[in-house]
A protein has these predicted regions:
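Bacterial Sec-dependent N-terminal signal peptides
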Residues: 1-22
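Histidine-/acidic-rich catalytic cores in large beta-rich domains
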Residues: 20-306
Length: 306
């Protein structure tokens, strides 16, 4: 009898231990979406694929802590960003490294894109053709900013960051070709300096960004802080999110790089100008804070039809 009781105690203890939640607070309602969750903790070099029970289904290991983007591709490969510290770009979301792992955790391609005057940051996006879109911050010097009509009072750090979108075509194990490019600095308007080419009435140019609109920042170099980039293959359009502007922008991806630097060309005839923007009408002199609809948003994305 004593042996039986001891056995039952051991069995119940083991059962309780196995039944305990070892991965933190867990909620899995009947109506929850039946899918996996991809997680890359900010202070870890690990990436986890979890099921709805909180169990680790698969795991990848990098030598870099994450940037701010990770994707599980249809073929089972893992595409992620890694963080490389850059003293010239000190803001949340800095990456600088892109890595591609196969299902068995083999690193099959990597690409470094960070230097003293530029860095990949926040989001990337895998395109259907195998190319990769990425957000890049590049330095506009004080002279370049003034030439573009920046008010000197809005140059508190002596420079500003241009936000750039690059489409790269990976090859080899650590290389890529840039096959398409878009820059916000090509699509600015300002009403401060009438001697500059981009001088105009801000309210009459909602398809361009007011270079002197300062929102939720003290005119620092990081005046836009774009944090998300997504692609719609049916429309061949991009949606770009600016946390500091509290706006999202729709951009034509069908343009050539040359057209993307202008206001003409592409499927929609607008070049690289905004096709649509939403979130903060005050940013283009069409509203005030009373009718602002976005506030420091992250990760807008396209919703499938239906």
């Amino acid at each position: 009898m004593r042996t039986l009781i001891l056995f039952l105690c051991c069995f119940l203890t083991t059962t309780l231990m196995l039944g305990q939640n070892t991965v933190g607070t867990l909620r899995n309602d009947l109506g929850s979406y039946d899918a996996y969750t991809l997680l890359s903790p900010i202070n870890s070099t690990e990436t986890y694929l979890l099921n709805n029970c909180g169990q680790v289904v698969h795991q990848w290991t990098s030598t870099y802590t994450p940037g701010a983007s990770v994707y599980l591709l249809e073929n089972g490969n893992l595409l992620r960003t890694g963080k490389i510290a850059n003293n010239n770009f000190q803001f949340g979301g800095v990456g600088g490294k892109i890595e591609l792992f196969d299902w068995d955790n083999n690193l099959i391609w990597e690409y470094t894109y960070t230097d003293s005057t530029y860095t990949q940051h926040h989001d990337i996006y895998p395109l259907p053709n195998g190319n990769i879109l990425m957000i890049v911050a590049t330095v506009m010097t004080e002279a370049e900013a003034l030439q573009a009509g920046r008010n000197p009072a809005n140059l508190t750090q002596g420079e500003v960051f241009n936000e750039q979108i690059l489409e790269i075509q990976p090859f080899g194990t650590n290389q890529a070709n840039v096959v398409w490019e878009w820059n916000i600095k090509d699509h600015l308007v300002q009403d401060f300096d009438a001697t500059k080419d981009n001088f105009g009435v801000v309210a009459d140019n909602p398809n361009r960004l007011d270079f002197n609109y300062i929102n939720a920042t003290n005119a620092t170099a990081n005046w836009l802080h774009c944090n998300s980039l997504q692609y719609n293959p049916a429309l061949d359009q991009l949606v770009l999110s600016s946390r500091i502007m509290s706006e999202i922008y729709i951009i034509d991806h069908s343009t050539t790089t040359a057209e993307a630097a202008t206001s003409t060309g592409g499927t929609y005839g607008k070049g690289g100008d905004f096709l649509y923007r939403w979130g903060n009408k005050a940013a283009y002199d069409k509203g005030t804070s009373s009718n602002q609809t976005l506030f420091g948003q992250h990760y807008p994305h396209w919703i499938a039809d239906g």
